Amino acid sequence: MSHLDDLPSTPGKYKTDKVPPYGILHHHRYLRLSKLTLWASLFLALFLFYLVLSPPPSPSRRNLNDSSSISAAKYGGSHWEKQVRKSARPRSHGGLTVLVTGASGFVGTHVSIALRRRGDGVLGLDNFNRYYDPKLKRARQGLLERSGVFVVEGDINDAVLLRKLFDVVLFTHVMHLAAQAGVRYAMQNPGSYVNSNIAGFVNLLEVSKSANPQPAIVWASSSSVYGLNSKVPFSEKDRTDQPASLYAATKKAGEGIAHTYNHIYGLSLTGLRFFTVYGPWGRPDMAYFFFTKDILKGKTITVFESPDKGSVARDFTYIDDIVKGCLGALDTAEKSTGSGGKKKGPAMFRIYNLGNTSPVPVTKLVTILEKLLKMKAKKKIMPLPRNGDVEFTHANITLAQAELGYKPAVDLETGLKKFVKWYMGFYTGSKKKSSW
């Protein structure tokens, strides 16, 4: 019996067969190309401005990406290359060969295991930064290793390492999930967002466009790009030029930059705007996660309300549903049309919302957690601060349903029940503890 068979929630509990090829898509239908190009130009200028004015980090002021200083010279040799090739080798006929960046992150772990379980080849890359406790990432790494996924420890800004990986493996696809996450932390460490979400993405695109053959790329954008948009539900064709946080701005910049590389170099690119992903093995900086921790410890939790005293609401999306969307995007991605940095024809460019399309007030989230934990929360109601958070999110998933076969199936209470079961096992040593 597999060590994953008794999981409270695992990639693989749902059907992960490949989505049939979509064919020729009208993939420019919702995109305003001129605005994307403008955003790409603006944020490339922002990045250059950052590079020029930023002083070199001193030993006492290292950012979260310390691991980016690790040279690719650390890697190589026959044993290392054997591990890389073995992990990336598909086990099924016609299987994909996928480089997953941010593989030991929340979404990256689930996607990597789902791909591996259906027979695809998967190679992980992660820098194990300290944005949250690296021990959680190391534990996820253990799951990946037991599933046959080798994770290279390195940074997406390390061009030498990336080129080495592309030399060793002919990747058919890249699932780019590495990023500096979190809305509020951007106010404390803005440089890390520019470094990872813009510079790191550009570095990956540079290496990918020079590859022969070029891989198709699916990358994580964010629902945060909708910013101050008040039209609901949020649709891919809605305006995204009013970001409410630096995190959102870097994600929007990524979309513009991706379009530029698609247009100039023929890279096949698909962006996925995730809406508040939650579930087992999640991120400790997310509300559902630290609410659970603080309720169990008897600490007061802060619940924000909108300026009109209404409840802040989120389109909470369970991790298994997000994984389905990621696999659907990979399976329907057309091949890139360039080779060795030269475009040979138009290439696919797509943007999709991946949400649950059922916004839930945060107050209801707390009520569900109280029920599952059998403890009453000590709540402090506060006005929503102007630190980048928005009052609500609501995804229109019509496009993803039609073109990716995306159908979210897990409601918030069911998903939180699975999360709490995992949390109690992982952090409290519950007898119901599972390998997930």
From Swiss-Prot:
Active site: Y247
Sorted UniProt keywords: Carbohydrate metabolism, Golgi apparatus, Isomerase, Membrane, NAD, Transmembrane, Transmembrane helix
Membrane topology note: Multi-pass membrane protein
GO molecular function: UDP-glucuronate 4-epimerase activity
SUPFAM superfamilies: NAD(P)-binding Rossmann-fold domains
Gene Ontology CC entries for this record: endosome; Golgi apparatus; Golgi cisterna membrane; Golgi medial cisterna; trans-Golgi network
Enzyme class: isomerase
Location (main, coarse): Golgi
EC assignment: 5.1.3.6
Annotated NAD(+) binding sites: 97-128
Subcellular location: Golgi apparatus, Golgi stack membrane
Pfam families in the cross-refs: Epimerase
Tissue specificity annotation: In leaves, pollen and siliques, but not in roots or flowers.
Catalyzed reactions: UDP-alpha-D-glucuronate = UDP-alpha-D-galacturonate
Family per record: Belongs to the NAD(P)-dependent epimerase/dehydratase family.
Subunit structure: Homodimer.
Primary role: Involved in the synthesis of the negatively charged monosaccharide that forms the backbone of pectic cell wall components.
Entry protein name: UDP-glucuronate 4-epimerase 5
Upper classification of the organism: Eukaryota, Viridiplantae, Streptophyta, Embryophyta, Tracheophyta
